[in-house]
Amino acid sequence: LVYFCLIFVLAMFPYILCNLELIPRKSFKVFMGDSGSFFIGFTIVWLLIESSQAMSSLRESAILRPVTALWLIAVPLMDMVMVMARRIRKRQSPFTPDRMHLHHICQRLGLSSRQTLCVIVLLASLHMIVGVYGQRFNVSESIMFSLFWASFFCYATVITYSWKITRFVRKHQSKRKNINEHP
């Protein structure tokens, strides 16, 4: 399992280097497409299920607890649930595309693509740290699950009011811009 994870990460490394423009004097953009994204998502979920279940095909005992797996994929999981719930509430197909994902909201707030990436990576890292901490120090699964739901509630509240937050930020930015232009 460790070798598979290592190969998986190494295979994605060139993609990350190109899209973050980390190759000196070269500018490449690689579009993964739906199939690539679905494959990565499927592989990550498969790895989490495989590592969180005892008596799996690869070993006798679980590497991590199921609640830890939730923490490791918290941000994409919460984003997906919120987007699908919003679409269903609007009587749309949950698979209809829209621009209401977390990265769209961050960009509407005026963040650049790189800043948006940093915000999402920071948010995901914080959730992962909580999950790994709970696993490492053997915090009760019921406490970790309750904390996960509390985190989800906070995320849902912020996303639900994202339009108001966006309007407030833009209004505040325009006031600041007007003050700077007219001293």
Task: Describe these PLM feature segments.
Residues 1-109, 113-177, 181:
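Alpha-helical transmembrane segments
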